[in-house]
Amino acid sequence: MKDFPKKNIVILGNGISGITAARHLRKRTDRPITIISEEHPYFFSRTALMYVYMGHMPFEATQPYENDFWKKNNLNCIQASVKNINGQKKYLEFKNGETMSFDVLIIASGSKPNQLSCPGNDLHGVHGMYHKQDLDRLESLSHSIKSAVIVGGGLIGIELAEMLHSRGKKVTLIVRENSFWNRVLPDAESKMINSHIEAHGIRLLLETELKAINPSEQGGVKEVITNKGEVIPCEYVGSTIGVSPNVDFLKDSGITLGRGVLVNSFLETNLPDIYAIGDCAEQTQPQINRRPIEAVWYTGRIMGETLAKTLCGKREQYR
């Protein structure tokens, strides 16, 4: 088991909330800080992944900090996959069998894409566009994609449609609602986007859902079937039907879960010295007109700043 000579802080996740906590902690303390991420060892801008695929920038340009920034600031960055947490004995168990102890744990594990529920959802060529690994998979498949079906009427769905369209792929966008993003946009603006999507050569199917994904002989995607009985040949299905807190690995940790990690206004869990921030945190008593889970970049940053103050002696509530 890896131990540190000083009381150490371990942060699970290097998204905006985890990295903000690490940076603000480092400004106030010299305690050992370790940042663990399964996705990539260093912080990067997730929203810029589409521009990497479209050829507008290299992946390195999505990283706001040079790689040596972390070492210069004595922040230990590790790319590893955590299998389980023992909240009582205070150690992490990695998928490779190694363990790491902690004195303070900050869970900033973010979100995970929701999975399609129809048959064929686990075929090669069916995935979301959220992680860097999704970008890598899409890149590896691109040469064999002639037609793609995107499921979901949100921002990630339209971005993925634009990405594939930029490479000359035939794209069909399936939206359950009767107009694109009409739960957020006024009716006129939503309909204007419908027209804009179709004017750019993307087929838009409204009030439509996916019924099944049929496999090819090679185990990839051959076609999809909609709830209206239409068969659409394709080699790729993009699942962009929203996200959920990434907390499945915590089920045996002793940490109380709801949809996310349950925390009070000080971002504390039910176990001492274990906290949760960002997309994975669920407020037990959210403020009036606020949601229990706020999966937003800005609120994730504020949570990171707030918790850093608390851990350095200035106890502060998240607001």
Question: PLM ranges: what are they?
Answer:
Residues 137-185, 221:
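Rossmann-like NAD(P)H-binding beta-loop-alpha module
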Residues 94, 107-108, 150, 226, ...:
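Redox-cofactor binding/interface segments in oxidoreductases and associated redox assembly factors
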